[in-house]
Structures are given as C-alpha cells and as structure tokens.
Amino acid sequence: VRSRAVYTNNIPCGAMRGFGVNQINFAVESCVDELCEMGGFDRWQIRYDNALTPGGMTSTGQVLQSGIGIRKTLEAVKDVFQQSRHAGIACGIKNTGIGNGVPDTGKVKIVIESPERILIHQGWTEMGQGVYTMAVQFFCEVTGLSPEIVEVRVDTAEESESGMTTASRGTSIIGHSVIDAATKLKQDLEQSSLEELTGKVYQGEWTCDWTTALESDSDNIQ
C-alpha cells in the first residue's frame, strides 16, 4: 500500500468512511488470497474457518455475544462465488460508536409543517455516507408515511445533538433517535391526521452508555 500526504491551504473537512481502514483491509484481504494460492487453500473456506462467532473474542478482548453473521453471510454467497469465473471475496466486521466508556448521545427533532411536508432536524453532517437516506428510511418504516413528504435537515442551531461525524455512528445513534421520535408520531397518527398534527414537534433521543471504560478491569470489553 502506497500513500502520499499533501499539505495544502484548503479548509479541512470531516472524515468520510474509514480513516484509511478500507485501503488497509483491501491489502490484507489481497494477501490472504495470495497465501491461499501459494498454499493451495480455498479462499472461501479459509475465511469461513476463521470467522468470528458468538462466544469468540476479538483482538481487543471483547467477547462477542449476538449479531455475528459472518458465517451466515459466507454461506449465502458460497454457490455464487464458487460458480463465478471472476469473483473476489473478503470479510470484515464493523463496530459502531466511540466506546471507551464515553456516553454517546444522538438527538433529533421532527416537525410537522403541513400534511405534505415533514422536517427531520438532526446534527449529522452528510458527506455521502447516506445519513439522510437512512433517517428517512427509519422514519417511514416506523410511521408508514411516504418518503416524498420527508426532508432531512442538518441544523446545529436546532439543538440536535449528534457528537462527532466519526466511527460510523450515524445509523445507530441517529437511527435510534429517529425511531424514538417517529414512534411518538405514530401513536398520535392513530388518533389524528397529519393536518390536525400540523405544527407539532416530536423530540427523539438515544444514548449508548454501556461501553467499557479504558481503565476498567473486565473479562468482557464492550
């Protein structure tokens, strides 16, 4: 992997996916493929045999519990991969959130401006990672309303706390906050129409406060 750093006078921007991790992963997976070729191993099988599973421990000491779907994912693509002449395969597991015992909070505000216009105020900077799309999908999934009437707006003046735009936190932190606010709207929609709810504001909030602090002596790092 070769890289070049350039010092410029441009205004710095936030990170957009990975801080270089994607490039390193590409190189590591390529090395795994080369080792398989040299040793006569099956590229799919070596990844399956070494995949993390519930009860396993990561390199940082976290004992995994649920939601580990690497093997199921590999099983789902096995036939397609092995039948394709030109196909690559790679595996990865992604955490979300800052961790280290730091409470991580997200807040949103949903405003019913009219029956044809609903605003979702949130503080997450959209740089192509799909935060706006995710917020609309969560909102519509909960309420059953059309995405055509929903607009997502980033506005820190609206006190929509989000923290840093880092660590792939958008889907979990903002997503849960949208669910919280949208659930309240859904309850009102069972009794009232959007026209009757025009002008109403719904606050949503979600906090991840269960991660392990750096100085903690724990057998299971979260």
Indicate residue ranges for each PLM-predicted region.
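Cofactor-centric catalytic regions
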Residues: 1-3, 27, 37-39, 43-119, ...
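Gly-rich Lys/Arg/Thr-decorated short loops/hinges at beta-loop-alpha junctions or inter-strand turns
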Residues: 7-16, 56-58
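Intrinsically disordered, low-complexity segments enriched in polar/charged small residues
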Residues: 7-9, 22, 174
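A short glycine-threonine-serine/GTX helix/turn-capping micro-motif
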Residues: 12-24, 167
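Phosphate-handling active-site elements
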Residues: 143-147
